A protein has these predicted regions:
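Small-polar-interrupted transmembrane alpha-helices in polytopic inner-membrane proteins
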Residues: 9-16, 67-87
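Membrane-helix interface segments
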Residues: 1-2, 62-70, 95-96
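"…centered on the first transmembrane helix and the immediately adjacent amphipathic helix/loop
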Residues: 1-54, 131
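Interfacial helix-loop-helix junctions of multi-pass membrane proteins
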Residues: 28, 80-101
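Membrane-interfacial, low-structure loops and terminal tails that flank and connect transmembrane helices
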Residues: 121-137
């Protein structure tokens, strides 16, 4: 149950961070680098959310192409929810380009899982699944 709670806790963390001004946690001295890094995090942020859904599914043997697609859609839709939320937060904004970056991150992670877990079967997820099967039998 702890592993199933991880994506929910992460979603709450995203929500809380989105409620703060963009420079509330950290602001780098070089504003161009600061903006670049924070904008680049959109690509990673929702990919991590997708992976946090995928790991417990893989370990429990419930990761199928369909469940992978479902959690990818949930992760991508949460990106939209996050942008809508940010539109109501002072000093924050919501943009279509941010949603696009969120979705690109999810799609990249989904494609990686699709190729390595379902086709090659040589991913860390496969190793985790096999390890879990050994210790529970």
């Amino acid at each position: 149950y702890v592993s199933l709670a991880l994506p929910i806790v992460y979603m709450i963390a995203i929500w809380v961070m989105s409620s703060l001004p963009h420079n509330a946690v950290i602001e780098l001295p070089n504003s161009k680098i600061d903006v670049f890094l924070k904008e680049s995090l959109h690509l990673v942020e929702f990919a991590i959310l997708y992976i946090l859904f995928v790991i417990p599914l893989a370990i429990s043997g419930k990761l199928t192409f369909k469940t992978s697609m479902i959690v990818a859609i949930i992760s991508a839709l949460y990106g939209i929810t996050d942008e809508i939320h940010q539109s109501f937060v002072p000093y924050r904004s919501a943009t279509l380009i941010d949603v696009t970056k969120d979705w690109i991150g999810v799609i990249a992670a989904w494609a990686h899982v699709r190729y390595h877990y379902f086709h090659r079967q040589k991913s860390i997820l496969n190793k985790l699944t096999n390890y879990y099967a050994k210790i529970t039998n």
